[in-house]
């Protein structure tokens, strides 16, 4: 991301298709900042333990918005998790950071099947310049990537403008 500003609120929307009926139980999603810290959005438990993805075995996330201000925890949701959910860890951990740099979505897949994932970061900053990425609008920095096998997949967004994160929300679509 090349825009300047300090994060005051960050959300992320994710669309993910695992390609496997019970695929979510094999996935863990983390957002990594350009400054080395990360937030876990949600995790699977291939042994059937809970909590994970609302205890659901569904394989996909559709227009799933990870937002600290949501009243529903991701683990209390139901597949395909459309709409806003609180992530496993707080996105406010990014508050006060600069928005500028390369953001990565880390997908850990432990079952060997592939899929696709795309994400869009929606951020509010304390910058005096207008926010080019208003919540749930268009024009957000986003990325899409396919994953396969038992591997880790990174999706990166480059933000080059200076600024500090004050709130971070993430939308993930697993398709």
Predicted regions and their residues:
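Loop and turn regions of beta-sandwich accessory domains that flank beta-strands and are enriched
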Residues: 1-175
